[in-house]
């Protein structure tokens, strides 16, 4: 499972393509991770918008206040898991990125 991704293209270009009025910090990010506000493209009935969101979801059934957001889903079981079953049909977005990777620590 991947826990990091890379943004190297200027987000400003994405803003122009999407025709969004959102202003975002336009830095390269070679270590985009779940605790950061990161750019996505979302579609609404009146058009597309660029939004900054934190990566991950907290399922509606999670009761603990310190529940860690889910950041990955397996495509093989996404339509079976309670956490994603409804969301996959109704709530989608485009994640602005150039690539993704899994962090590997060596001793």
Regions found by a protein language model. Give the residues of each.
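Short linear sequence motif anchored by a di-proline
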Residues: 1-105
């Amino acid at each position: 499972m991947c826990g990091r991704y890379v943004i190297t293209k200027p987000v400003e270009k994405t803003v122009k393509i999407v025709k969004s009025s959102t202003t975002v910090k336009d830095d390269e990010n070679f270590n985009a991770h779940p605790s950061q506000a990161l750019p996505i493209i979302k579609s609404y009935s009146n058009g597309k918008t660029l939004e900054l969101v934190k990566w991950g979801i907290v399922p509606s059934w999670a009761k603990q206040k310190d529940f860690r957001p889910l950041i990955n889903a397996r495509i093989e079981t996404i339509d079976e898991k309670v956490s994603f079953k409804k969301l996959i049909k109704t709530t989608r977005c485009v994640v602005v990125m150039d690539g993704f990777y899994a962090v590997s620590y060596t001793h």
